[in-house]
Swiss-Prot record:
It comes from Rhizobium etli (strain ATCC 51251 / DSM 11541 / JCM 21823 / NBRC 15573 / CFN 42). Gene3D superfamilies: 2.30.30.790. InterPro entries: Ribosomal_bL19 (IPR001857), Ribosomal_bL19_CS (IPR018257), Ribosomal_bL19_sf (IPR038657), Translation_prot_SH3-like_sf (IPR008991). This is Large ribosomal subunit protein bL19. Coiled coil: none annotated. The keyword Kinase does not apply.
């Protein structure tokens, strides 16, 4: 492995640690949550459409998503490892026999539909995705519980310190009164 590939692998691993993208291919309907910065505000915008192509490799890998917005076809190219992509959700799996679905640009209506894939591979991928989402949710819930317990312990320690200080002040007042 040369130095460039090694650096790319390290960067890809760093980005994968922050967020993991599901396995998807051309023909799948995906929802891409993109961070949009307007002035000094940042918000998340969902872009849902059909993945019509995946190209490149390594850190330069891209995927193209096409949707019909107000009767007009809109395509957007997203880098897979972009920090602006918050998450990608697979809405449904498509059954296609091409790697590039550029022919959809010329189609309208029913001829532009993609048949849903209900095969074993699609079910396996969907089950794996659901398991990964459930695992991530369980991890986040565990973190929330741990944070709540730490906060409760901190509050209890603060209250105990206050009670101890009040008891010492009362004892000091009694000795001063005698």
């Amino acid at each position: 492995m040369n130095i460039i590939q090694q650096l790319e692998a390290e960067q890809a691993a760093k980005i994968e640690a922050k967020r993991t993208l599901p396995e998807f291919s051309p023909g799948d309907t995906v929802r891409v949550n993109v961070k949009v910065t307007e002035g000094n505000r940042t918000r998340v915008q969902a872009y849902e459409g059909v993945c019509i192509a995946r190209s490149g490799g390594g850190l330069q890998e891209n995927f193209t998503v096409r949707k019909i917005s107000y009767g007009e076809g809109v395509e957007r190219v997203f880098p897979v490892y972009s920090p602006m992509i918050e998450s990608v959700d697979v809405v449904r799996r498509g059954k296609v026999r091409r790697a590039k679905l550029y022919y959809l640009r010329d189609r309208r209506g029913k001829s532009a539909r993609i048949v849903e894939d209900t095969g074993v591979r699609a079910r396996k991928l969907n089950d794996a995705e659901r398991a990964a989402v459930a695992e991530e949710k369980a991890r986040i819930d565990a973190e929330k519980v741990a944070a709540a317990q730490a906060l409760a312990a901190e509050k209890a320690a603060a209250e105990a310190a206050e009670a101890k200080a009040a008891a010492e002040a009362a004892a000091a007042a009694e000795t001063a009164a005698e």
